[in-house]
Regions:
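Aromatic-lined substrate-binding rim segments of carbohydrate-active enzymes
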Residues: 19-27, 31-100, 130-133, 229-237
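Hydrophobic targeting/anchoring helices
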Residues: 205, 244-435, 522-527, 534-543, ...
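Polysaccharide-binding and catalytic clefts of secreted carbohydrate-active enzymes
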Residues: 92-294
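A conserved amphipathic helix/loop scaffold
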Residues: 459, 467-699
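Short, well-ordered coil/turn segments that N-cap beta-strands
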Residues: 1-3, 29-31, 62-68, 138-143, ...
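Short, acidic/polar
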Residues: 12-27, 125-127, 131, 257-271, ...
Length: 699
């Protein structure tokens, strides 16, 4: 386990601070520093590479017994790039040449710079990565590489990019591979092109979906490929140290906007196939991210990593500042909870942004872990405690593996592409996923995220939730049908699979659910803001957009939960050896907004129906709208380790462990306070050890 901090974004902090800062970093319980190795700074003159400042920083780190993470910032390009590679500028969707400029938070270098589909630009970039690897791969205290920071490539492009000839050529090659040639594309798109060169990418939303969705998909794949190419350059030099990359958020939270496509920085699941690990940035206080959202955020990254390394690559160090505004306080206790939340999800490296307050541009006077917001002493004291505990209990934490889940939530990028093709925004789709995830986090029901192209291993799951999954293709429908036929449970919302990846609408009888005798009658206007579901109790749930009742079918429902004008609106159906829970509207989005506890009760009942029974249950206190007990667990060399996150220091929780997990009278040690807890009939009474949380280990 490594706990560190970002330090240097050239040329700041200035060299007069380095010696004392690195000593203070070590004294604060941190063991790693991250340095931004900027292409523009290192190669300010073509083919001359100056690493003098990095050499000195790395030497100071070694003297202070600090490991080093090197972040290759190749996306901040040299000022000479367009002079040495003429015509390398990106082109926007209107045909305009993109004028690069200094990035808002970086003092030297151009962004977005030249298009990396231009071979000459890529070779220049690859040379920088290669030179950096050759210089530092042999360091004894190198912890690893962050090969691509926040997966940035189009920042400050000021419009949709890139439509340069090189990228358009790559798009045509990609289409050729996707569809097996022009005939396959014409058949799928229902067009009559005479050559691939005539196929134009989608230009703007609210126009035909087909080419717009394909173009967005290509842009995602383009970023995936670029990450793989960066990684390959470094791996050719360094096969010892991990090569990771991180996004500004998990890929499922890139919803797009009017000047950027959703998931345009790559798909974490695809990135993890070639990298050694995946990370993301998180600024919880600045972004209003509470425990539930932070928990699902880290779970997204862990799920995508698929057993590879999980890094929290940028975590908020101090108070945020943008321009002449400051935002809230970063106090010690919540910051420590971010660390332990990451650990509970299996993160092995956590890096804070940053050590000192920034001094450049819009971020001036912000973000410093040791910054001058009045709270640095408490933050550093808390960090020292955590660093010491991680060192003392390294045998436990270094071998910790999170427990597995029996529930999966499906993330479908094609949903985002369709939504953006119409609305220039994939927010509906992201919120739907996060609504269901939040309901599970608040009940401490383990779950994972699934991605639409990674559904080959579903045997360990009992329940798969498909939030707003309006786009499904053959691969997904085949895997999901096999899952339910073999005994799994699917929870689906309205118009599941109503579109294919080409953006054509399917009639209800042609959709995924029709094979199980579940056929929607069509969209009906909302008459109320919610419906009552009748299970073993009546639950009023909020809904939105429309309702889609079902036609009568030979597959009669096992249970009818709700009706609309005499037609089934929500029900349980038998399907092979499994079952399908059909909901004829959208429930996750309004729950995320209104936090109706009845939705949580419904999800818990569906989980039980699917055969899911969490091995650890929170007996008390019951969650309120804003407060809840959050539990994560796993094992370290066979020993159970359980993390509890409390709403307050004065809270006491009763936690029940299943007999399969622990004997009914087992003893646990709370590692922060060294308190020994004896289970009574499998129930532990637990108080926070520190930071409104507890870490329990088998005694």
């Amino acid at each position: 386990m490594n706990l560190g901090v970002q330090y240097y974004r050239a040329p700041f902090p200035e060299s007069k601070y380095w010696e004392n800062d690195f000593k203070a970093i070590k004294e604060a319980g941190l063991d790693t520093v991250q340095l931004w190795v900027l292409w523009a700074w290192v190669e300010s003159k073509p083919d001359f590479f100056n690493y003098d400042d990095y050499d000195r920083l790395i030497e100071i780190a070694a003297r202070n017994k600090l490991k080093v993470v090197l972040s290759t910032i190749a996306e901040i390009q040299p000022h000479w790039i367009h002079r040495i590679v003429p015509g390398s500028e990106m082109i926007d969707h209107l045909g305009n040449k993109v004028i690069s400029s200094l990035r808002c938070e970086c003092n030297f270098g151009l962004t977005p710079g030249g298009c990396t589909d231009n071979p000459a630009v890529w070779e220049r970039m690859a040379q920088f990565i290669r030179k950096t690897g050759e210089r530092y791969a042999g360091l004894g205290h190198l912890h690893g590489w962050d090969i691509w920071n926040e997966l940035r490539w189009n920042v400050q492009a000021d419009n949709l990019v890139c439509f340069c000839p090189h990228t358009i050529q790559e798009f045509h090659l990609w289409l050729d591979q996707q569809y097996g040639g022009l005939d396959g594309l014409n058949a799928a798109w229902k067009r009559r092109y005479v050559c691939l060169e005539d196929v134009a990418p989608g230009k703007l939303p609210d126009r035909p979906y087909t080419e717009m969705m394909a173009w967005q998909h290509f842009i995602t794949e383009r970023a995936n490929r670029h990450a793989a190419r960066r990684c390959a350059v470094m791996k050719a030099i360094d096969q010892v140290h991990p090569v990771t990359a991180h996004g500004g958020c998990p890929s499922a939270d890139y919803r797009g906007w009017d000047k950027g496509y959703p998931i345009d920085r790559g798909n974490d699941w695809a990135l993890a196939e070639t990298l050694d690990g995946i990370g993301c940035s998180s600024f919880p206080q600045w972004g209003g991210i509470d425990d539930a959202e932070f928990g699902s955020r880290v779970e997204m990254v862990k799920s995508a990593a698929n057993g590879k390394r999980v890094w929290l690559s940028e975590v908020q160090g101090g108070r945020a500042a943008v321009g002449f505004n400051i935002y809230g306080k970063v106090e010690a206790a919540p910051q420590q909870r971010w660390i332990w939340n990451g650990l509970a999800c299996g993160a092995d490296t956590i890096l804070f942004w940053c050590w000192r307050d920034e001094v450049f541009g819009r971020e001036s006077a912000g973000f410093g872990l040791a910054g001058r917001d009045g709270l640095a002493p408490q933050r550093l004291e808390a960090m020292k405690f955590t660093g010491k505990l991680l060192a003392e209990k390294a045998e436990i934490f270094n071998h910790y593996i999170p427990g597995s889940a029996e529930i999966g939530i499906l993330f479908t990028p094609q949903n985002y592409y369709l939504a953006w093709a119409q609305e220039a925004d994939g927010k509906r789709m992201g919120d739907a996923i996060n609504g269901y995830a939040r309901s599970l986090v608040r009940q401490s029901i383990p779950y994972c995220f699934l991605e639409e192209q990674h559904l080959d291993d579903l045997q360990h799951l009992k329940l798969i939730i498909l939030p707003r999954s309006i786009v499904l293709n053959d691969y997904q429908t085949e895997r999901l049908a096999a899952f339910v036929q073999n005994g799994g449970t699917l929870l689906v919302e309205s118009e599941c699979g109503a579109f294919g990846r080409e953006g054509f609408y399917r009639y209800p009888e042609d959709r995924f659910l029709a094979q199980f005798g579940i056929v929607e009658a069509g969209r009906r206007n909302l008459e109320t803001a919610g419906i009552t579901l009748k299970l073993d109790e009546e639950l009023f749930l909020d809904i939105e957009q429309w309702v889609t009742p079902l036609e009568e079918s030979v597959n009669a429902p096992v249970q009818v939960f709700s009706t609309f004008n005499g037609q089934v609106l929500a029900a349980e159906f038998k399907a092979g050896q499994g079952r399908i829970i059909y909901l004829g509207s959208y429930f996750g989005n309004p729950y995320l907004e209104k936090r109706n506890p009845n939705f949580e009760s419904f999800i818990q009942k569906v989980s039980v129906l699917a055969g899911v029974k969490p091995a650890i249950e929170v007996i008390s206190p019951a969650p309120s709208r804003d407060e809840f007990i959050y539990v994560k667990s796993g094992r370290s060399k066979g020993r159970l380790v359980t993390y509890l996150f409390f709403p307050g220091d004065d809270c006491t929780a009763k936690i029940k462990f299943s007999p399969e997990l622990l004997p009914g009278s087992a003893k646990l040690t709370e590692l922060m306070s060294n308190q020994v807890i004896t289970l009574i009939d499998g129930i532990a009474t637990v108080k926070p050890g520190r930071f409104k949380m507890a870490v329990l280990s088998e005694a």
